């Protein structure tokens, strides 16, 4: 983590670049949460897969977007409006765009060292709020 250049302005990253990073962070945080329960690997994969997919991430995006700082709303909107060329068949185009927006927000929070904000979002997932 020490090799990441945090001095680059967050606006210099595209929405898709932020989503690329946010996707990895999202999955890592969800995996870390479920790992603590001592589940076997197939069970871990089942639980993680239920939370790391566009349909679910779209729901989380809708829950959090109105409560975010304006800076993160703008990042989410920019990512949502990115020129995404392919979409999975497991969700609608809008769900995929909203999931991309959530991932971009998570990626931006990570680069801005807003770990507590990421934890708040993860807690929504964990507590099912």
UniProtKB/Swiss-Prot annotation:
Name the cystine pairs: none
Q: One GO BP annotation here?
A: RNA processing
Alphabetized Gene3D superfamilies for the sequence: Ribonuclease III domain (1.10.1520.10)
Which Pfam family would be a valid example here? Answer: Ribonuclease_3
> Which InterPro entries is this protein grouped with?
Mini3_fam, RNase_III_dom, RNase_III_sf
Keyword Hydrolase part of the UniProt annotation: yes
UniProt-annotated catalytic positions = 23
Q: Which GO terms describe its molecular function?
A: ribonuclease III activity
Q: Spell out the coiled coil positions from the record.
A: none
Name the keywords, alphabetized. Endonuclease, Hydrolase, Nuclease
Q: What does this protein do?
A: Might be a ribonuclease involved in RNA processing.
Read off the PANTHER family from this record.
MINI-RIBONUCLEASE 3
Indicate the family of this protein: Belongs to the MrnC RNase family.
Protein name (record)? Mini-ribonuclease 3-like protein
Q: Which organism is it from?
A: Fusobacterium nucleatum subsp. nucleatum (strain ATCC 25586 / DSM 15643 / BCRC 10681 / CIP 101130 / JCM 8532 / KCTC 2640 / LMG 13131 / VPI 4355)
Designated gene of the protein: mrnCL
């Amino acid at each position: 983590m020490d090799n990441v250049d945090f001095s680059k302005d967050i606006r210099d990253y595209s929405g898709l670049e932020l989503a690329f990073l946010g996707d990895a962070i999202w999955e890592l945080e969800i995996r870390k949460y479920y790992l603590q329960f001592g589940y076997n690997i197939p069970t871990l994969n089942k639980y993680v897969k239920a939370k790391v997919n566009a349909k679910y991430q779209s729901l989380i995006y809708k829950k959090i977007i109105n409560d975010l700082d304006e800076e993160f709303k703008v990042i989410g909107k920019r990512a949502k409006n990115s020129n995404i060329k392919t979409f999975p068949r497991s969700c609608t185009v809008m769900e995929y765009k909203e999931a991309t927006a959530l991932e971009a927000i998570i990626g931006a929070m990570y680069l801005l060292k807003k770990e507590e904000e990421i934890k708040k979002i993860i807690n929504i997932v964990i507590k099912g709020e």
